[in-house]
Amino acid sequence: MTSFQEVPLQTSNFAHVIFQNVAKSYLPNAHLECHYTLTPYIHPHSKDWVGIFKVGWSTARDYYTFLWSPMPEQYVEGSTVNCVLAFQGYYLPNDDGEFYQFCYVTHKGEIRGASTPFQFRAASPVEELLTMEDEGNSDMLVVTTKAGLLELKIEKTLKEKEELLKLVSVLEKETAQLREQVGRMERELSHEKSRCEQLQAEQKGLLEVSQSLRVENEEFMKRYSDATSKAHQLEEDIVSVTHKAVEKETELDSLKDKLRKAQQEKEQLECQLKTEKDEKELYKVHLKNTEIENTKLVSEIQTLKNVDGNKESMITHFKEEIGKLQSCLADKENLHRALLLTTSNKEDTLLLKEQLRKAEEQVQATRQELIFLAKELSDAVNVRDKTMADLHTARLENERVKKQLADTLAELQLHAVKTDQEKTDTLEHELRREVEDLKLRLQMAADHYKEKFKECQRLQKQINKLSDQSASSNGVFTKRMGSQQKVNDASINTDPAASASAVDVKPAASCAAETDFDMSAKDHVCEVTKEMAEKVEKYNKCKQLLQDEKAKCNKYADELAQMELKWKEQVRIAENVKLELAELEDSYSLQLAEKDKEINCLASFLENLSREKELTKSLEDQKGRKMEGQSPQQVSRCLNTCSEQSGLLPTLPAAQPVLQYGNPYTAHETRDGADGAFYPDEIQRPPVRGPSWEDNVVCSQPARNLSRPDGLEDPEDSREDENVPIPPDPANQHLRGHGAGFCFDSSFDVHKKCPLCELMFPPNYDQIKFEEHVESHWKVCPMCSEQFPPDYDQQGFERHVQTHFDQNVLNFD
């Protein structure tokens, strides 16, 4: 066996044209239709032709007969086209037992497609008859035709089909109901999901609002921590001041000791003066010493004065610290008010109030500590005043400063209270004043609107009167002109000169009076219209201002109402959302449990239906197998002897997987009626061994057709190649060595069993049919007849078949 070469079917020349519905055999003298498909890999030509070749051909000249391939109508390049050719019966070969195949040859002489092999055989009358047992449970055998048996089977299958259709309609109705239920549940689930998503979005909004409130609370806490840190810093400053005061007190004690020592020394000096009056020198020295001590005391007094100055600076520092504390208290009070205005949460306000109360207590404690320190300082000053007279003034000043500080603190507190009260009073007064102003403006606007309306009516009446007056004046003027014309006509005949002068004067006077009246009327109308326009503009402005004031009032009222109701609504919404989420979770859990139960019920129902179908199928199979009777022994013996004498089994290719355009090397199985009695869906047809063709195959070139295809040599030249033996194929020799295949002996009266599918057959079953069934499990190469096991790879089998065409490349040069 040669090595296989991987060649895709798309690139093979023999797969460009696919022959469809090729039978295993055809009648010799009957018309034959050839169906084939042109793939996108071939471009048709008007000189392309389809020929019948004997299997084993070597060149395109080895055709038996051919027909020109018609050019497809409306052909589009790159598309697939189905074509049909009809071969006449008198051009076809006779029943010679040879295998033939269709080949598509292009105008260049290239073979681009080949069909599966087939034979030309005449039908025998024995093959059309069948024997079967009588249905009346008698031992009689009934001989019928295949057509009758097939009609009975068709009637049975139609009845079964009707029953199955009824069952399918019932099942379809049930499935439609189940689908409706599932769709309804899915719609409910989608509705619930959308509702859940909406609630989740609302919850996210509430969480964002709470987060913003938390951020504000954190900011207030930071401010409070800053204030507490400042208070701690002030406490530390107070502690440092107390330490300094203690140090000063120790210094005062040391000064007191020094003063006592000085007094003792002075007493000693006085004693020495009394005792030693004579010793002037010593007295002078003693005076010098006393002067020195006095200077020291003066310096000490100066130092004490400096200390007093330091105390004053400390007092000023304390005043500044007290001012800072007061500013901190004011800031805390402002923060407290801001918190009361901004936050409506009761718990937060209580916490902040508690924190403010603690801070106020701490401030009060610091104030008390300051008072205690002031008292201690006053005590120290009193002691110092007792010891030194010079420091008495400082003590008085210190007390005065303390009084001033207390006064200032009291004044500041009173001022803060007064300012707060004044602010509230001013706000209330301003709001009341604005409300009263708005009321007055509304009243004034209403009065003004009434006045303007009255003025408009009055002016409208005046305009109507003026228009009437102008119309009447025009009528009078026309009448006067007519009468004047008559007077002028009468005076022409009497006194021409006088009449002429009168005519000249009177018309001029009448025209001047009329024009003056019209001008005054027009001026009056213009003034009235201007006044009306100005008043209308003023009215519109007042109306606009009134609307603006109303809008502002409504806006302020709405904002206050919204600020009051906002937090309550948020709290209520949050509680409702929590309750709804809990209810939704419970409802979802219940719905899921119910749907799981329904799904389990449907699954169990479908399993029961499938089991019932399988049981009905198995019962029908058993009934069909029981209905099949045993064939008569005489017919089986005759058929067995015929098969033993012939010894040749036809090779039938196995069923292959479906390709894109069909496999050109697989035959469409056309099972006869007898084989169809044993469930053709379960019976397959691979071969056991290849056909025992002769080693020396003679290729002849018949001259039936008068015309020959273009591009080929003269048929007379090809006749020289007749009777030339073709060397035997090594694959065929290999198969002949193993040509025994399966040995079927019909002499044993036992049930026949397929060695591959383990299907049981009756003892008298046709041996040829049984062998064909066993052969149907195997795969046979259509070129070399090599057999392959049933589980052999389909691609490997196709590669093997392709190697035969690759090894025998055709040359037309």
Curated annotation (Swiss-Prot):
One Gene Ontology BP term is: apoptotic process
- Where are residues bearing Phosphoserine located in the sequence? S124, S138, S225, S618, S631, S692
Q: Where does Zn(2+) 2 bind?
A: C781, C784, H800, H804
Q: Which UniProt keywords apply?
A: Apoptosis, Coiled coil, Cytoplasm, Cytoplasmic vesicle, Metal-binding, Mitochondrion, Phosphoprotein, Repeat, Zinc, Zinc-finger
Any one GO molecular-function label of the UniProt entry:
zinc ion binding
Locations listed in the record: Cytoplasm; Mitochondrion; Preautophagosomal structure; Cytoplasmic vesicle, Autophagosome
Q: What are its GO cellular component terms?
A: autophagosome; cytoplasm; cytoplasmic vesicle; mitochondrion; phagophore assembly site
Query: CDD domains under this entry?
Result: Zn-C2H2_TAX1BP1_rpt1, Zn-C2H2_TAX1BP1_rpt2
Keyword field contains Transferase: no
Pfam families attached here? CALCOCO1 (PF07888), SKICH (PF17751), Zn-C2H2_12 (PF18112)
Detail which positions bind Zn(2+) 1.
Answer: C754, C757, H773, H777
Spell out the residue ranges making up region: Oligomerization: 320-420
Query: At the top level of its lineage, which domain of life is listed?
Result: Eukaryota
Zinc finger feature spans (UBZ1-type):
751-777, 778-804
- Post-translational events: Phosphorylated in the C-terminal region by CHUK/IKKA leading to NF-kappa-B signaling down-regulation.
Region feature (Disordered): 667-732
Q: Which residues form a coiled coil?
A: 144-596
InterPro entries from the UniProt entry: CALCOCO1-like, CALCOCO1/2_Zn_UBZ1, SKICH, UBA_autophagy_assoc_protein
Q: In its keyword annotation, does this UniProt entry include rRNA processing?
A: no
User: Chief localization class?
Assistant: cytoplasm
Domain-related comment: The C-terminal UBZ-type zinc fingers function as ubiquitin-binding domains.
Instruction: Outline what the protein does.
Output: Ubiquitin-binding adapter that participates in inflammatory, antiviral and innate immune processes as well as selective autophagy regulation. Plays a key role in the negative regulation of NF-kappa-B and IRF3 signalings by acting as an adapter for the ubiquitin-editing enzyme A20/TNFAIP3 to bind and inactivate its substrates. Disrupts the interactions between the E3 ubiquitin ligase TRAF3 and TBK1/IKBKE to attenuate 'Lys63'-linked polyubiquitination of TBK1 and thereby IFN-beta production.
| Subunit text | Homooligomer. Interacts with TNFAIP3. Interacts with STARD13. Interacts with MYO6. Interacts with TOM1; the interaction is indirect and is mediated by MYO6, which acts as a bridge between TOM1 and TAX1BP1. Interacts with MAVS; this interaction induces MAVS polyubiquitination. Interacts with TNIP1. Interacts with TRAF6; this interaction mediates deubiquitination of TRAF6 and inhibition of NF-kappa-B activation. Interacts with RIPK1; this interaction negatively regulates RIPK1 ubiquitination. Interacts with NBR1. Interacts with TBK1. Interacts with RB1CC1. Interacts with SQSTM1.
Q: What is this protein called?
A: Tax1-binding protein 1 homolog
Gene symbol of the encoding locus: Tax1bp1
